[in-house]
Amino acid sequence: MERERSNFFFLFLFCSWVSMAQPTLSLSSDGQALLSLKRPSPSLFSSWDPQDQTPCSWYGITCSADNRVISVSIPDTFLNLSSIPDLSSLSSLQFLNLSSTNLSGPIPPSFGKLTHLRLLDLSSNSLSGPIPSELGRLSTLQFLILNANKLSGSIPSQISNLFALQVLCLQDNLLNGSIPSSFGSLVSLQQFRLGGNTNLGGPIPAQLGFLKNLTTLGFAASGLSGSIPSTFGNLVNLQTLALYDTEISGTIPPQLGLCSELRNLYLHMNKLTGSIPKELGKLQKITSLLLWGNSLSGVIPPEISNCSSLVVFDVSANDLTGDIPGDLGKLVWLEQLQLSDNMFTGQIPWELSNCSSLIALQLDKNKLSGSIPSQIGNLKSLQSFFLWENSISGTIPSSFGNCTDLVALDLSRNKLTGRIPEELFSLKRLSKLLLLGNSLSGGLPKSVAKCQSLVRLRVGENQLSGQIPKEIGELQNLVFLDLYMNHFSGGLPYEISNITVLELLDVHNNYITGDIPAQLGNLVNLEQLDLSRNSFTGNIPLSFGNLSYLNKLILNNNLLTGQIPKSIKNLQKLTLLDLSYNSLSGEIPQELGQVTSLTINLDLSYNTFTGNIPETFSDLTQLQSLDLSSNSLHGDIKVLGSLTSLASLNISCNNFSGPIPSTPFFKTISTTSYLQNTNLCHSLDGITCSSHTGQNNGVKSPKIVALTAVILASITIAILAAWLLILRNNHLYKTSQNSSSSPSTAEDFSYPWTFIPFQKLGITVNNIVTSLTDENVIGKGCSGIVYKAEIPNGDIVAVKKLWKTKDNNEEGESTIDSFAAEIQILGNIRHRNIVKLLGYCSNKSVKLLLYNYFPNGNLQQLLQGNRNLDWETRYKIAIGAAQGLAYLHHDCVPAILHRDVKCNNILLDSKYEAILADFGLAKLMMNSPNYHNAMSRVAGSYGYIAPEYGYTMNITEKSDVYSYGVVLLEILSGRSAVEPQIGDGLHIVEWVKKKMGTFEPALSVLDVKLQGLPDQIVQEMLQTLGIAMFCVNPSPVERPTMKEVVTLLMEVKCSPEEWGKTSQPLIKPSSS
């Protein structure tokens, strides 16, 4: 009995266990396969219960009547799978949608076993590797959507076996090769998109013209070349053809006129030539026709007016000629007509006023003549009208006052006459009124105050007269006020000071009199103030010290008196100060030397200043141009020797005395720079005047100068020869002393050292060598390892240990001497934007370079950190690096190539000034075995190497320019040259080009931390973006020099004439 009870108890436990285990064991194989999708994220999909018998009730899952999974649709979830699991057991699967699920790794070839699959959507992930050819087995597949991944390799030709395929989306990947011509067999295909694969090349197969079911064909932003196949005329169902930003050339095939369903034709930014086919006029349903940015010629065919549905017509930036067809006035749905930057002639057809839906009319940069038709006032929806740079004459029609939606009106650079119609100022939305460079006359009407929406009022270079109306001070939103080069008279109304948002005030070249209103000091946002070439009297207002954002102050050619106010020291953003041709007196204040931001120009000439040059001028190390001529200054000029960035100097017609500094700059400038300073003299050391030399207007005779130069050169050569001989003998002696010792290791520090400091250093070789430990490593690069070494006085220096160049036994005396000579050249370089080489020490095995230490790190660390780096700091770093590089290229003889310009080699001091490091070291390392196996390092670092190096193997100044352009793009975008998150792994140059080739605005390239800034700053950044793209031009010949780059960058903040231009920006965004 007891045994029976025991058996019953164990039977009960077994049955209980079976009943509990049964749900897990009964989950179907389909369910088991699906669970592998959530393995990295178990908390996902609470409804996916492994206790269920089937997954048919799970989220995103659909089953057939026999409980087989036929659909898996879980887009926009965070699966976070590093590889897609094997799902081939889902043999009934028809729909698989894993888009935007954070997948990576390759596409499994086993997907080719899912023979019932009708939809495969893996888009918007990080999938890599090739597209498996096995997908060509999916005979029932209708939708293959793999866009926005990192797929590489060529497009498998086996895809052409998918006869049921309707949608093929492969855009925005890294595919290469060409489009298989066999794709012409995909007769069911309706959408075919390949855009954004920049490495995809070759011609467009003519066979694609047989895919008569196509509605969308997109190959934009790729490397496709050749011509547009004429067979595309067979695509009678095509609605969108996007072939912009490619290498496509040739003519536009007239057969496209047969594509009767076409709505969008995007052929902009290509290399198309020839004329616009009149056959395009047959496209009755087309709404967007974008042909801008090609080399099209001929006229606009009048047949275009038959495109009755047209909304956007953009043929700007071509070579089109002839008249603008009046028949375009028939396009009643037209909203954007963009014909700018061509060679159109004739008059503006009045018929355009019939385009009642017109919002934007851009006719700028042509050769149009005649007057502006008064009927333009019929365009009640018009928001922008650009007509600048033509030859339009006559008056400005008062009918513009009827265009009540008008926001921007630019009629600059024409031949307009008459008055500015008061009706313009009744426009409640007008924010930009640009009338520069015409022959307008009369006064500026008081009614200007009615236009409260005005942000930019630019009427310079006309013949306007009378007083500037005080009512202008009521324009509370005005940012730019240009009244320069007119005939305005009377005083400058102090009411202008009420416009507290004003950033630019330019009234130069008028007849304005009286004192400069002290109230202008209330314009705390002012950045540029130009009152030059008027008849202002009195003192420079002390209140100008309040203008903390001012970067240009131009007051020359007036009747100003008194002294420079000491409050000038508060203008710490000032880059240009011109006070020349006035009657200013007294001493130049020491405070002026404290304005260390002065970089472009300081001009105090033709005044009556007395006293010495302030000692504080030694801090103006960024200043490029200084003019102190025609004053009554005296004393020595040794302080000018500290101005290491000077490119232009004039101190003539003063009473200076003593020696002329012996810096390289003073050795190269013309004697006219310091004429009529009878007590100036030349000097060998810059401290004392040379003996036995005559003085004539502060300049020695040419014979004496030549003789001095010869003597100096001879002494230098003799000293150098003696030094090299001693070095050679010491080396031979040390070598013989060590010849009997055991062979040294690769890092042997026991060899005798040679230590050459380039300035006084309180450090010994032992201090340096003992610091070369792993704990002190602060960086590794192409040229060597960098250590931090502490000097006994507490200072810190950076020590770079160069990679070994050759085997110790092979390194001869000539190699040592050559290295010493190269280092001597680098040690003589002095520039505020170049790291100073303090000295070097070497022995038979090791070479060490000593530099200043910069605790703020480098630009790469700054950009990739979490700091909100503002535009001013970025611009400061960009221009500092450019100035340093320009110095190496243009001011060093012979020129020095950097060879490795990158963010890691741009160090930052405590004030975030850019300091170039590692200049010229690549040349020293070219014999290194480390480089022998990676020669590309000699040309720079990955991501920064100029494209021509791949086929020329030559390095030039233009190679450095390309690398600098990449750095500039990194500064603007906040991204690295190559990183996974840049547009699917694209190089930053290609990423920017891709952005500019889509419908995204240029602003989308900029760092998100730079979004939402004032319009003027946005324009500065866009101009800088244009300069960067100029630098990374694929053709070295087309790139600027670094000196030109510096000038262009200076002009970003130097050109008030270009501020606020309402025309197309430097890089034109795609139209839409």
From Swiss-Prot:
Residues 1-21 form the signal peptide. Residues 728-1072 are cytoplasmic. The chain crosses the membrane at residues 707-727. The active site is at D900 (proton acceptor). ATP binds at I778, G779, K780, G781, C782, S783, G784, I785, V786, K800. Phosphorylated and ubiquitinated upon interaction with RGF1, thus leading to activation a subsequent degradation. Autophosphorylated. LRR repeats lie at residues 66-89, 90-113, 114-138, 140-162, 164-185, 187-211, 212-234, 235-259, 260-283, 285-307, 308-331, 332-355, 356-379, 381-402, 403-427, 429-451, 452-475, 477-499, 500-523, 524-546, 548-571, 572-595, 597-619, 620-642, 643-667. Keywords: ATP-binding, Disulfide bond, Glycoprotein, Kinase, Leucine-rich repeat, Membrane, Nucleotide-binding, Phosphoprotein, Receptor, Repeat, Serine/threonine-protein kinase, Signal, Transferase, Transmembrane, Transmembrane helix, Ubl conjugation. Residues 772-1067 form the Protein kinase domain. SUPFAM superfamilies: L domain-like, Protein kinase-like (PK-like). PANTHER family: LEUCINE-RICH REPEAT PROTEIN KINASE FAMILY PROTEIN, OS04G0122200 PROTEIN. Binds to RGF1; this interaction triggers the formation of heterodimers with SERK1. This is LRR receptor-like serine/threonine-protein kinase RGI5. It comes from Arabidopsis thaliana (Mouse-ear cress).
